[in-house]
Design a protein with these regions (language model features):
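Surface-exposed loop/turn motifs in large extracellular/passenger domains
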Residues: 1-546
Length: 546
């Protein structure tokens, strides 16, 4: 015990201060408590102890800075794609995909006695810098499996899962995507973060694709980021840990401005085409999840506060289909088209799109006794036409869930949720993505009728929440949507925002909520629309091919 008070921990710092292009340069600026850049490969039972500070420009993680799928364009001297490439069928391609995906099994990081701090300093959002996570900053097709035994093998009766844990966490700071466990997760096949070397995988497959969509789905799923059996806890149960997206910048005249990270969450900042948890083991008992019986559960323990810009949530900031798969996903006015997705639709099976959705099973968020406070500060307009949506969304569990599913999850000890536009006790914005705009798709109404033939529009484009609940602190939790007095053209055609607040969900656009509850709600406040359970619902369908 005497020696314990003299453990000072160790620091990991990547010195590069700004993004640069060039060979081996765009990947740099990453740091992790165990590994900096992990491109492919497997780690089993690798533990890092007494980590004090991890700091980097592009990506910082308590365990790994970045996990990236290796480039599938060439492997040694063998060219896989292209004019001289090997013509692999998609069955063989699946094996190739798995070779290029990085895997971490049964490995954890423990901060030093006074808590671990993870910081990502990059402000160049365009090039994907500024990602921070308690475990990993950026994962592109990464696999993190804590639901196995210590040797990375499947559990047998009587054996406890080793976990992929972050313990003794004090604070995570970043300027792009910030999360208690992971900054940003996306699929290796559809990466739109600046990974350069590894982003062309799906395009290479499509170029050699003829008409086997079922096989394509299996390849896509092999490169989806999956996280199971991951747990985040603080160093001090009374104080907990914070996810802080606020930072200050100075202009040429020395004036200081406070800015905020795009996405912040108690577990994940941003999720794209990711699967968290296991649908088969998350059944629990009755309608509620039972983490004690679910080795793949994802838990957040001792969360105090989450502060972000466009999206903030107790578990995740933004969970979306990959913007590669979204026509209406960019900033309003941007070039709204995605050739990649249109090629997938022309393949003839809308079911391919399932591979782009984000799924969360058995995510549990437990706040400190004072309660969790979640704040989102920045309002922007995304999408177009009937796919237009506003950011500045906050929720006790998630800020924005766009084309995703959350099942058997809960938030406990919620104090307050504050956002600019869509704010909810559980999720601020349950929405659809502008995956297809009929005039951009050039598919004709016959092709669009595939929606009715192969899947319901709601199943592919809507967002679902099932068997989940939010529980406030004993004094009750509050939900507030406010522009803080700013003029945003309220209720006009030129409005730059829309205040919608609800006790469980703020704005539910083409959404399904089933078997859910909110307890200890105190007050819901909005300048426009407020509801005890849901602020506003809409079923504006996505494809309008008149």
């Amino acid at each position: 015990k005497f020696l314990e008070s003299y453990i000072f921990g160790f620091n990991v710092v990547a010195g590069r201060a700004e993004y640069r292009t060039g060979a081996n340069l765009h990947d740099s600026g990453v740091a992790g408590g165990h590994v900096g850049l992990m491109r492919t490969g497997t780690i089993t039972d690798g533990q890092s102890m007494d980590v004090k500070t991890v700091s980097a420009m592009r990506a910082a993680g308590g365990y790994a800075g970045t996990m990236e799928s290796g480039s599938a364009s060439s492997f040694g001297s063998i060219q896989l794609f292209g004019d001289k490439g090997i013509k692999l069928d998609l069955g063989q391609m699946l094996d190739v995909a798995q070779v290029f995906v990085p895997v971490i099994k049964s490995s954890s990081v423990a901060g030093y006695r006074k808590g671990m701090k993870v910081v990502a300093t990059g402000e160049d959002i365009t090039h994907g810098t500024g990602n921070a996570g308690g475990y990993v900053g950026l994962a592109v097709g990464g696999q993190i499996w804590g639901d196995l035994d210590q040797n990375g093998q499947k559990l047998v009766k009587g054996v406890t899962a080793a976990g992929a844990n972050v313990s003794n966490l004090r604070k995570v700071e970043g300027r792009n995507n910030v999360g208690g466990f992971i900054g940003v997760a996306t699929a290796g096949a559809v990466a739109d973060v600046d990974t350069n070397a590894s982003e062309g995988f799906l395009q290479g497959i499509l170029d050699s694709l003829v008409s086997t969509p079922a096989s394509l789905v299996s390849v896509l799923q092999a490169t989806v980021t999956t996280i199971r059996g991951a747990h985040v806890s603080s160093d001090d149960p009374a104080w907990g840990y914070t996810v802080d997206g606020a930072y200050e910048t100075k202009d040429d005249k020395g004036n200081t401005t406070t800015k905020y990270a795009l996405n912040a969450g108690g577990f994940a900042g941003s999720l794209q085409a990711s699967i968290l948890g296991d649908k088969d083991s998350a059944k629990g008992t009755g309608s509620e999840a039972d983490p004690n019986n679910d080795p793949a559960a994802l838990t957040v323990t001792g969360l105090r506060a989450v502060e972000g810009g466009q999206y903030a949530g107790g578990f995740f900031g933004l969970a979306d289909v990959s913007s590669v798969a979204s026509v209406g996903g960019g900033e309003a006015g941007d070039k709204q088209n995605t050739n990649l997705l249109l090629k997938l639709l022309k393949v003839g099976n809308v079911g391919v799109l399932e591979a782009f959705r984000t799924f969360i099973y058995d995510g549990q968020v437990n706040g400190v006794n004072d309660g969790i406070q979640v704040v989102a500060h920045d309002s922007t307009t995304k999408g177009m036409l009937d796919s237009k949506r506003y950011t500045g969304a906050a929720g006790g569990f998630g800020g924005g869930l766009i084309n995703g599913s959350v099942k058997q999850s809960a938030v406990t000890n919620l104090n307050s949720v504050t956002g600019v536009n869509y704010v909810g006790g559980f999720i601020g914005h349950l929405g659809k993505s502008g995956t297809v705009a009929a005039d951009n798709a050039q598919l004709g109404t016959d092709a669009l009728n595939l929606l009715g033939a192969t899947a319901g529009v709601l199943d592919i484009w809507g967002s679902h929440v099932g068997d989940s609940r939010v529980i406030g602190i004993p004094d009750g939790y509050t939900v507030t949507a406010t522009h803080h007095g700013d003029n945003y053209g309220k209720a006009t055609d030129k409005a730059t925002g829309r205040e919608v607040a609800g006790g469980f969900v703020g704005y539910a656009d083409l959404a399904r909520v089933k078997g859910c509850a909110s307890d200890n709600l105190k007050k819901v406040t909005s300048g426009e629309i407020a509801g005890g359970f849901v602020g506003e619902t809409s079923r504006a369908y996505l494809v309008d091919a008149k």
